[in-house]
Amino acid sequence: MVKDPRFYEWRPDSPYRIYADGKWKGERQTPDWRRKALDFAEGSFKRIDAVSGILEQGGEGNMQEALCTLARELFFLHLTVRESSGRAVKALNLLSRYTAPAPVPAAAPEGKEGTLFQGSFRDLPFEPAEGPYFPLHAWLFSAAVFGKHKEKEWQGKAEEEGQRISPRCGSTEAAELYNFLRGTLIVEGSAAIPGVISAVEELERRQDENGFWPGISPWHGYNVLAHSDLASAVRQLDKIEKNIIAMQNRDGSWGI
């Protein structure tokens, strides 16, 4: 779908440009690409070190923003160096400490868990969702892209979360269903994870006549379902594809 080979050229040092140059322009093995990727990754690690101190200090508001930053920098590492180095594993372990759902504030609106994560979701492949599960979904995704999905910790947390969400799909907001799928569909054989099939089929029930999903950005929905070969996912992709193409910018981006 990319219409212009200069995709993201207006952000030459962004992780998206680095990723695009490496994947679509075949520059991943060149010294210049490697230098740019390592330079950006070094900045990510410095930002991770900074937020680790904030997380140690506590404080709900600061922690929420820090967790979003931690997830974002892990995503940027995935776009650039994509290596399970000691520092990347340390960052994953830090995020893992916050995957247990946080207590719901007493002031949460009746019938709502409360939007616990008010931090900036810009540049994150997730949707702001009510409830305490964002760190878990972000960790599932990040750990998977760094090759940890075959380990007992990942499999145990994915299964436990799938068992929680499966019987609740019909009453779970679309953003939370999407975030769960973002953390699991990236893994080969994800259909075997409890809740995955139910969540995909629930999104199909909510998809409107134009292919859009209320509560989920269309490019996020399209991208995550493209990782699945489930019949329901394929039908949803077919339904929205025409409109996804129509929404694309001249340079091939979608509003980034």
Where are these regions (language model features)?
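Preference for long, amphipathic alpha-helical scaffolds in soluble/luminal domains
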Residues: 1-256
